[in-house]
Amino acid sequence: MTVDAVRVELGARAYEVRIGPGLIARAGAEIAPLLRRPKVAILTDETVAGLHLDPFRQALAEAGIASSALALPAGEATKGWPQFARAVEWLLEEKVERRDVVVALGGGVIGDLAGFAAAVLRRGVRFVQVPTTLLAQVDSSVGGKTGINTAQGKNLVGAFHQPSLVLADIGVLETLPPRDFRAGYGEVVKYGLLGDADFYEWLEEAGPRLAADAEARQRAVRRSVEMKAEIVARDETEEGDRALLNLGHTFCHALEKATGYSGRLLHGEGVAIGCALAFELSQRLGLCAQEAPSRLRAHLRAMGMKVDLRDIPGDLPSAEALLALMAQDKKVVDGKLRFILARGIGQAFVADDVPGDVVRTLLEDALAQR
């Protein structure tokens, strides 16, 4: 299999997302052209370090690149002030200079945190994303959104800071636990839902074999990245079209906050549930036929994924409390909730005027089924 390259066109800050097998083994040769001195600082997590850090550092060493690494605890709880401060202090102790490169080796948590650290360190150093989860490869590693969570909500502190290169090694996805792979699929299916009905139709057929079929997996990652790159190139800082990428996320972020950013609900699982709720909301508002949310739920069920609020273990707050959590979402404009709704599969759009009582009733009905 060959390596695919998708270019994110952002003028002088354009970069490539390289997708294919064996990219970690070739990481030194891939990263070397970016370096002004043969040294990088790697931020990773303890789980990824045990699987991929040694091969990655060996690949760098073979290209004559020295490296140091800090492994943070794995999990969403790491994406907050304490570990962020620890990472920045460590980068300063490592004497990372403005012309150097920081490497984010891991999933979305590490990519977001390391990218934000790179954005603020010495007012901005370059960084390379080496995403090791399906979710990070198709979504969080591309587009320059970086940040951390706070007590008030998810991703409320951060910066737009584009990577200089993304290396998406699809081979490492074979080491993912099945639940993590399925969670990442929540972001893959989102792309078909928001703007490519043909891709969604292909996923209905190919989705169940992605974990075992490297060629299908690479196609799914490539098409997802192509769609994100196109949208980011048009709207880097989310003033317009880029908001479409938040399909399912208004519900998702509230549910993640309600479950304490814990193992009860992974981000991609929340996205899948959020997409199902967004399509159900669209149907209730008369925007799409009932067939669309029913078809989506059937596909997610066939993939073994969480689909409804009843699939989340443990207690959940009331519909009113979930609405209050949504009001903290960073997509709120002039105090109004923004939802990504759909007129059908592949036909998403941004809506600023969704009646709160319709959302409340939707949530009440979903909670009543638990």
Swiss-Prot record:
Gene name as annotated: aroB
Cofactor binding: number and manner: Binds 1 divalent metal cation per subunit. Can use either Co(2+) or Zn(2+).
Gene Ontology cellular-component annotations: cytoplasm
Gene3D superfamilies according to UniProt: 3.40.50.1970, Dehydroquinate synthase-like - alpha domain
Cofactors that this protein relies on: Co(2+); Zn(2+); NAD(+)
InterPro entries xref list: Dehydroquinate_synthase, DHQ_synth_AroB, DHQ_synth_fam, DHQS/DOIS_N, DHQS_C
SUPFAM superfamilies registered for this protein in UniProt: Dehydroquinate synthase-like
Residues where Zn(2+) binds: 187, 249, 267
Single GO term (MF): nucleotide binding
UniProt keyword Amino-acid biosynthesis present: yes
Function (record text): Catalyzes the conversion of 3-deoxy-D-arabino-heptulosonate 7-phosphate (DAHP) to dehydroquinate (DHQ).
Protein location: Cytoplasm
Catalytic activity entry: 7-phospho-2-dehydro-3-deoxy-D-arabino-heptonate = 3-dehydroquinate + phosphate
Record's protein name: 3-dehydroquinate synthase
Bilayer-crossing regions: none
Similarity remark: Belongs to the sugar phosphate cyclases superfamily. Dehydroquinate synthase family.
Pfam families found in the cross-reference section: DHQ_synthase, DHQS_C
Keyword set, alphabetical order: Amino-acid biosynthesis, Aromatic amino acid biosynthesis, Cobalt, Cytoplasm, Lyase, Metal-binding, NAD, Nucleotide-binding, Zinc
